[in-house]
């Protein structure tokens, strides 16, 4: 007799639903698993036999063949233990268990208990895509709280409990533990910002339009504090976006707590290019992937190696990075927002006080950052000490709601394709001609102007919006090298 059940396996952050077929027939007792199982899957045979015994369930006598579909995909890990056991129970019809489309994900212990697994966030997106609506896990399994609304949840303590619930067709929707819910970002501590009204407006523009930013200034001027506070302005992710983020975060941190807040990654300047990009035999995500849909914060950007910074070119352009995993090219998501800080020179005081650096040293210092990376940064802003003492203007918290509204407006109007008025077109054309702007400069100025208009609640981009955008990204004067040595 044939029985089947649905399980799942994970490859990196991707999940594949597996259809487990079991055939129990006459013949010499033998338990075979086919369908490209690795050693961890094959070891399930011993765990399943013992789990049946301790659950008080008769283990079928005769020839047992288990097939894992699709057979062409290599199966690894212990996620399939419970699905294999349920398929065997259904094939043996002792006890009789109805077939359904529930996905079973748990490891079996020798005493029949269900062992929770790490990294299940990706299952939600895969099950939804394939039209599956019921999930069975351990009672101790931590799951993202959106699962409670997305699926019928069946939680069981052991194999005997699974059998009881399936025979009674009871699918219990149980709330995930409250510890999985992260408090809104507005309740978190935000470093106090004294003054900085110009910089706060700039941060709001960057947050609303996902513009990249490099802040240059002397030590102690506040650029790092501003960079740290930037994430406070970002709106929450959607549930689908948060599940996608969690799928990758759980690879690096199995104890990752699900949250709607965008991730913020702050790698040390000694990190290698491999550490930024990820890859390797096990498909480990790098910092650019862990910052997907969030912020990659590079404090003291010029202390990073030239090779590490140059590695950012592809993910900044494509929003993804192609890595080699087990000899196969694999695309990792890397749509991050770069926020960086830097000193103007090795001593840190060029243009801000008594600088002891020779011009040649300053030029050599800035050559640590590849020109193409600087060109891809939307705004290079110099933070002055005088600016840091200015008072007035909206507070950081006051900008949060404006950024949220501007982000929604940009999304509803297809973002950067908002209409420029005739006057705005003329201002943009004349400025770009006068300043010999490149096509990239022109595109970035138009995008900045669109964001500025959205912050004011406007669909149409007006001339003043373009004029402000030109101030933030002035073609021909963005080079920190030029500004630092003059």
Segments and roles (model prediction):
Residues 293, 299-301, 311:
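Walker B catalytic acidic pair
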Residues 1-213, 218-225, 324, 460-463, ...:
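Peripheral, non-AAA+ core regions of ATP-driven protein-machinery
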Residues 59-62, 98-99, 131, 208-210, ...:
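Short loop/turn elements that form and flank the Walker-type P-loop nucleotide-binding site
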Residues 213-254, 318:
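Walker A/P-loop
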Residues 204-206, 257-263, 268-296, 328:
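Conserved alpha-helical scaffold flanking the Walker A/P-loop in AAA+ ATPase domains
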Residues 47, 51, 84-87, 122-126, ...:
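Alpha-helical scaffold elements adjacent to nucleotide-binding pockets in ATP/GTP-utilizing enzyme cores
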Residues 111, 298-305, 348:
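Catalytic P-loop NTPase motifs of RecA-like helicase/translocase cores
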Residues 34, 40-45, 60, 67-77, ...:
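Basic, amphipathic alpha-helical bundle interface domains used for macromolecular binding and assembly
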């Amino acid at each position: 007799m044939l029985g089947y059940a649905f399980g799942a396996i994970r490859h990196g952050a991707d999940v594949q639903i597996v259809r487990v077929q079991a055939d129990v027939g006459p013949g010499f007792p033998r338990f075979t698993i086919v369908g490209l199982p690795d050693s961890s899957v094959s070891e399930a045979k011993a765990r399943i036999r013992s789990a049946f015994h301790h659950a008080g369930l008769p283990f079928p006598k005769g020839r047992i063949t288990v097939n894992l579909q699709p057979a062409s995909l290599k199966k690894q890990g212990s996620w399939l233990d419970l699905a294999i056991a349920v398929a065997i129970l259904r094939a043996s019809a002792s006890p009789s268990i109805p077939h359904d489309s529930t996905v079973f994900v748990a490891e079996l212990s020798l005493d029949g208990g269900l062992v929770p697994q790490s990294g299940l966030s990706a299952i939600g997106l895969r099950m939804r895509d394939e039209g599956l609506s019921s999930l069975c896990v351990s009672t101790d399994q931590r799951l993202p709280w959106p699962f409670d609304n997305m699926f019928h949840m069946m939680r069981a303590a052991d194999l005997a409990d699974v059998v009881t619930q399936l025979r009674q067709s009871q699918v219990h929707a149980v709330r995930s533990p409250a510890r999985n819910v992260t408090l809104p970002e507005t309740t978190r501590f935000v470093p106090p910002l004294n003054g900085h009204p110009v910089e706060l407006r700039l941060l709001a523009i960057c947050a609303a339009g996902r513009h990249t930013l490099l802040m240059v200034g002397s030590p102690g001027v506040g650029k790092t504090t501003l960079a740290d506070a930037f994430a406070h302005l970002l709106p929450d992710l959607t549930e689908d976006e948060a599940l996608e983020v969690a799928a990758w975060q759980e690879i690096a941190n199995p104890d990752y707590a699900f949250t709607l807040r965008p991730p913020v990654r702050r790698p040390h300047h000694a990190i290698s290019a491999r550490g930024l990009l990820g890859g390797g035999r096990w498909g480990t995500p790098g910092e650019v992937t862990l910052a997907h849909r969030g912020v990659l914060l590079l404090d003291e950007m010029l202390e990073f190696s030239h090779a590490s910074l140059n590695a950012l070119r592809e993910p900044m352009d494509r929003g993804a990075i192609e890595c080699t995993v087990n000899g196969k090219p694999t695309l990792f998501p890397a749509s991050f927002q770069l926020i960086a800080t830097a000193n103007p020179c090795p001593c840190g005081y060029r243009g801000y006080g008594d600088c002891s650096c020779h011009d040649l040293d300053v030029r050599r210092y800035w050559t640590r950052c590849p020109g193409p990376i600087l060109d891809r940064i939307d705004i290079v802003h110099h933070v002055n000490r005088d600016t840091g003492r200015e008072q007035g203007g909206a507070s950081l918290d006051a900008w949060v709601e404006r950024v949220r509204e501007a982000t929604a407006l940009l999304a509803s109007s297809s973002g950067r394709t908002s209409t420029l008025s005739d006057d705005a077109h003329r201002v943009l054309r004349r400025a770009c001609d006068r300043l010999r702007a490149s096509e990239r400069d022109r595109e970035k100025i138009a995008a900045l102007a669109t964001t500025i208009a959205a912050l004011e609640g406007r669909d149409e981009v007006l001339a003043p919006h373009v004029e402000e955008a030109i101030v933030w990204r002035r073609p021909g004067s963005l080079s920190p090298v030029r500004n630092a040595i003059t």
